[in-house]
Amino acid sequence: MKFRKGRPKIPRLISEEPQFKLFKPAGTPGTELESEVLTFEELESLRLVDYLNQPHEEAADAMGISRRVFWNILKSARKKVADALINGKMIDIGGGYYKIRECNYEDECQRGRNCRYGVSNCLTLKKDSE
């Protein structure tokens, strides 16, 4: 029997599963390409920091993890994306250990789970209501 050391792993919170889950270089059949698997939480870390320009601390809080764990996820995601772009690999997005974040502000947002910017808006609403 194998025992795991340390704390139990908790699911990372993501805003939603992405609409597009596969990217590949144009003009090459997917069967001829190597692929990199980017987990949903790795994509979420890229979305929060590189797309929404959130500080690491806010992004880590939004995902329900420590800054150190967040940094490791982000570093892994950036390495995989860079490898795929430089070496012409396919990016397959899926898997990981995650949970869809519950939004308690559907009335204010009026978009519910389809909100692409739920993290920053919800964090702002949360701060305003406290």
Curated annotation (Swiss-Prot):
A Pfam family recorded for this sequence: DUF134
Q: Which domain of life is it from?
A: Archaea
Q: Which PANTHER family match?
A: PTHR37478, UPF0251 PROTEIN TK0562 (PTHR37478:SF2)
The record's family statement is: Belongs to the UPF0251 family.
Protein name stated in the entry: UPF0251 protein MmarC7_1642
Organism for this UniProt entry: Methanococcus maripaludis (strain C7 / ATCC BAA-1331)
